[in-house]
């Protein structure tokens, strides 16, 4: 029958069109640090809501141990970094002569110090002479060190105890240190369902000192050679992340369910984190907050984390 033949032709046309769309999708692998980490937050939302496909991409998110993640990116084995901190994964590598770029920011910096509820530590200066557990090699610690210095604390007066980042929450619970320096999502995991800890403010010093709300910290990093060859793809990657960020803000319960399942964290923990001001989900092109990034570099240099100020080409500008 003619109508059957026509119907079959329509179905075939649709199938070919859909197949063509998928065939044109650009495949990218995005390595991230292992869960629970901020770098692993966006992948579950992007994939579940197909924000990559909507932008002509087929993204694969791969979690790697911290040492492997950093080694593979520094060696150029990985062209992109989904847990790219502005300092550890871009500026520090530039300091060492590697040509890498910060494409766009996803999360601004947030950190704190936690002490037991009954502790006599009330402000950051009270840490003098105390034992502080922290993950010293991370990008979080030098920025905390800088903020603590602004708050009047000489870190040389503190007994530092180094710990792997995964060991900080158990360290806080055990009471083996007077205080523990944390960031998200570890802080939310620690305080969920209890009132055993207090947070010591250090974040207010950033705006007081610099005048900026933005505090560039973690986003997408890339090898410059990859950037040069894939400039048409980069706006699509940004758009996929932008859609995910908007979704998290407008659909927090659905987003929390997706993220919690993938990260292996209790859903109420993620719900509370999204509702708080601590997540600091703030998406922007690296060049959009150049002045704030320069303040980050100056801060890192002042505490000895960076040897020199990186050139402005470290911050990707989509207009160039």
Task: Enumerate the predicted regions with their spans.
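Bacterial N-terminal signal peptides that target proteins for export
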Residues: 1-11
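Short, surface-exposed acidic
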Residues: 155-158, 263-275, 307-313
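Conserved C-terminal helix/tail region of periplasmic/extracytoplasmic solute-binding proteins
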Residues: 297-320
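Pocket-lining segment of extracytoplasmic ligand-binding domains
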Residues: 166-259
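Sec/Tat signal peptide C-region and signal peptidase I cleavage site
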Residues: 18-23
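Secondary-structure end/capping motifs
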Residues: 227-302
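Short, glycine-/small- and polar/acidic-enriched structural segments
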Residues: 24-164, 171, 178-184, 200
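Short, solvent-exposed loop/beta-turn-alpha elements that line the ligand-binding surface or hinge
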Residues: 53-54, 204-213, 280-288
